[in-house]
Design a protein with these regions (language model features):
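Extended amphipathic alpha-helical segments with heptad-repeat/coiled-coil character used for oligomerization
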Residues: 7-10, 14
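Conserved beta-sheet core of the metallophosphoesterase superfamily
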Residues: 18-37, 42-43, 47-147
Length: 148
């Protein structure tokens, strides 16, 4: 899924377009390049909403619950999650039964983050495993080793 970020307005679109072109014959790989501030998917009994995260996170469950595009599947799902990024550090909480997970950043510290004192966050990637009936059943983290 493609999301425009506040740091990158065009590069991610071109990367997604290039990857979609490269994998065009692979039916198991899909690319969502639609311009939207929110996106969602359903995996079994779990609704997963996606948002950049540059907002008040506690408002996100209501945003998805009232969205014309996602309110139906949001309401029918047994489990509900919203995944965000933006803040470049990991955080997870539950708001009104919806798990909100802010993903860690893969990127290092650039000048803007350093000047703003947004430093020392653990760089990592998460792999989340879902079961059709039981929702999220596992989470794996791979930390990025820093070169000094």
């Amino acid at each position: 899924m493609l999301f425009r970020s506040n740091h990158d307005r065009t590069k991610s679109y071109y990367l997604a377009h290039a990857l979609a072109t490269y994998f065009r014959d692979e039916k198991r790989i899909l690319f969502d390049r639609e311009h939207s501030t929110i996106k969602g998917t359903v995996l079994g009994n779990t609704f997963i909403g996606y948002h950049h995260g540059n907002c008040k996170l506690d408002d996100l469950p209501l945003l998805f619950a009232t969205s014309p595009k996602y309110s139906g599947v949001f309401g029918l799902s047994k489990y509900r999650e919203v995944h965000t990024g933006d803040k470049h550090h990991y955080m997870a909480k539950e708001v009104k039964g919806v798990r909100i997970q802010q993903m860690p950043s893969l990127s290092g510290t650039d000048r803007w983050h350093s000047d703003s004192n947004y430093v020392h966050s653990l760089r990592a990637a998460l792999a989340l495993v879902y079961h059709d009936e039981d929702g999220k059943v596992a989470e794996f983290e791979e930390r990025i080793k820093c070169q000094h």
